[in-house]
């Protein structure tokens, strides 16, 4: 009996192409969504794995650093133990050497103290003898000195009195000579003036008398001639011959009188010339006196000028001495400051030497100064090289600074050690940088981070691929097997 509730199955109607296409599209969308979901799951898985790797890399880095520090501590501890053993052995050896040196020095010191005490006693004895001898000698010398001083004092006083008396006599004599010369000059000048005045008056009176005499004589002659002329004129009428004779006679006489007048005129001219010469002499004497007075005034002016120059020189010398005193004071202050700086620098050097002595090695404490690296032949050649260039002053200066040779040895040694340590430091820094770079590369190879992924790393492989640049493909392209990540993810999940 068939059940009433069930309906018979109807055959499926065939789907159209549109329905098939729609179903295919839905299937494709479902496949795409499943693929996207798988891709999201794969991405999330990779991110989780990357975070886990970063966490593990950080833990591994801490473990490596811890183990590396432990290893370094152990190595450093072993090295320090070895250094301490070496230093302890060196210290014991140096202590033994120092003990032997101290014992020998103590023995030498006791011997030196005994020798010093013996030498001091002998020296004090000799000094006492020399002091007594010197006191006697000083007493004799003092007595001789006092005697010679008295003799020299007496001689000096007598000679001084003689010189003072002689000086006073010469001063009086010079004053008398000066007064006498001045009086003689005044007297001679007065006599010359009187003589000149008397000669002038005599010549003047004589000239006046001659003029008066000639005038009278000429007047008489003229009157006589006039009278004769009148007589001749009277007699002219009497006889012409007598008048001619009288005229000739008068003519001759007139010529004689004219000659006499001419001679008298020449005499007058000579007298005038003599008067002019005397006037010239008077003028010359007056000029000479004025010139002498001018010379005296010039000498006086020169003396005043020299006096002013001496005063100026004295002022300049006083100013120069004051400037020199100020300059000397400034230079002395500068010298004291420079010496103070030198002393401070020396104290600083000594303090630094005390501080540096703590860091000296045992070898430096035992042998602080290295020996010369030159052979004896090279040292002789260095001494004989250019001996003419070394003067006596330079040799003295070199001898004064010979004690600084050991200081410069230590200074140069420290300088060389500093340069060596600087060079070694640069080498160690280079090695450290290389080791750091290698360690960084190693840590970058075992860790994953954005910074690591942004750089080239041959150890980083994603999907069996490195981030290094690919080499150009060969001419024949090989065939690769392609495996989808979905299959890998399904196997991993």
Swiss-Prot record:
A Gene Ontology biological process in which this protein takes part is: regulation of cilium movement
- Alphabetized UniProt keyword annotations: Cell projection, Cilium, Coiled coil, Cytoplasm, Cytoskeleton, Flagellum
Q: Is Phosphoprotein given among the entry's keywords? A: no
Keyword Coiled coil in the entry? The reply is yes
Q: Name one GO cellular component term.
A: motile cilium
Query: Where is coiled-coil annotated?
Result: 99-163, 253-280
Chief place where the protein resides = cytoplasm
Q: Which Pfam families match?
A: NYD-SP28 (PF14772)
Transmembrane segments annotated in the record for this chain: none
User: Where does it reside?
Assistant: Cytoplasm, Cytoskeleton, Flagellum basal body; Cell projection, Cilium, Flagellum; Cytoplasm, Cytoskeleton, Flagellum axoneme
Q: Which InterPro entries match?
A: DRC1/2_N (IPR039505), DRC1/DRC2 (IPR039750)
Could you give the subunit structure recorded for this chain?
Component of the nexin-dynein regulatory complex (N-DRC). Interacts with DRC1.
Q: Which family does it belong to?
A: Belongs to the DRC2 family.
Q: What does the protein in this record do?
A: Component of the nexin-dynein regulatory complex (N-DRC), a key regulator of ciliary/flagellar motility which maintains the alignment and integrity of the distal axoneme and regulates microtubule sliding in motile axonemes. Plays a critical role in the assembly of N-DRC and also stabilizes the assembly of multiple inner dynein arms and radial spokes. Coassembles with DRC1 to form a central scaffold needed for assembly of the N-DRC and its attachment to the outer doublet microtubules.
Q: What is this protein called?
A: Dynein regulatory complex subunit 2
Q: Which organism is it from?
A: Mus musculus
The organism's taxonomy opens as: Eukaryota, Metazoa, Chordata, Craniata, Vertebrata
């Amino acid at each position: 009996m068939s059940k009433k509730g069930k309906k018979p199955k109807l055959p499926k109607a065939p789907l159209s192409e549109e329905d098939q296409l729609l179903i295919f599209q839905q299937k494709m969308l479902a496949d795409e969504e499943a693929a996207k979901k798988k891709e999201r799951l794969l991405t999330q898985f990779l991110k989780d794995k990357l975070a886990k790797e970063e966490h593990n890399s950080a833990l591994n880095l801490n473990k490596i650093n811890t183990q590396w520090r432990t290893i370094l501590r152990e190595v450093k501890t072993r090295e320090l133990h070895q250094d301490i053993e070496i230093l302890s052995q060196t210290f014991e050896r140096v202590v033994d050497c120092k003990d032997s040196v101290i014992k020998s020095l103590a023995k030498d010191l006791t011997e030196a103290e005994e020798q010093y005490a013996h030498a001091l006693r002998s020296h004090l004895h000799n000094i006492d003898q020399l002091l007594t001898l010197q006191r006697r000698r000083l007493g004799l010398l003092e007595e001789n000195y006092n005697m010679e001083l008295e003799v020299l004092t007496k001689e000096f006083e007598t000679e001084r009195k003689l010189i003072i008396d002689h000086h006073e006599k010469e001063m009086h004599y010079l004053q008398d000579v000066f007064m006498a010369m001045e009086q003689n000059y005044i007297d001679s000048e007065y006599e010359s003036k009187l003589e000149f005045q008397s000669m002038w008056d005599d010549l003047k009176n004589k000239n006046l008398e001659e003029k008066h005499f000639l005038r009278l004589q000429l007047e008489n002659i003229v009157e006589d001639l006039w009278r004769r002329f009148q007589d001749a004129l009277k007699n002219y009428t009497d006889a012409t011959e007598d008048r001619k004779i009288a005229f000739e006679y008068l003519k001759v006489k007139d010529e004689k009188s004219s000659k006499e007048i001419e001679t008298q005129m020449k005499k007058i001219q000579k007298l005038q010339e003599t008067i002019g010469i005397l006037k010239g002499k008077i003028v010359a004497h007056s000029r000479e006196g004025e010139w002498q007075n001018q010379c005296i005034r010039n000498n006086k002016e020169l003396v005043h000028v020299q006096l002013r120059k001496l005063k100026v020189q004295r002022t300049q010398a006083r100013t120069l001495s004051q400037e020199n005193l100020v300059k000397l004071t400034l230079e002395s202050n500068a010298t004291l400051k420079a010496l103070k700086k030198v002393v401070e620098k020396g104290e600083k050097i000594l303090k630094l030497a005390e501080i540096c002595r703590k860091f000296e090695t045992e070898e430096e404490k035992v042998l602080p100064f290295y020996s010369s690296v030159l052979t004896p032949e090279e040292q002789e050649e260095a001494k004989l090289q250019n001996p003419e260039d070394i003067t006596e002053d330079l040799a003295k200066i070199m001898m004064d600074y010979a004690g600084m040779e050991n200081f410069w040895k230590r200074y140069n040694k420290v300088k060389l050690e500093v340069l060596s340590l600087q060079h070694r430091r640069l080498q160690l820094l280079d090695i450290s940088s290389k080791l750091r770079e290698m360690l960084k590369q190693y840590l970058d190879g075992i860790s994953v981070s954005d910074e690591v992924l942004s750089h080239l790393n041959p150890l980083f492989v994603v999907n069996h691929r490195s981030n290094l640049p690919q080499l150009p493909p060969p001419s024949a392209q090989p065939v690769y097997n392609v495996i989808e990540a979905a299959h890998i993810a399904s196997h991993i999940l």
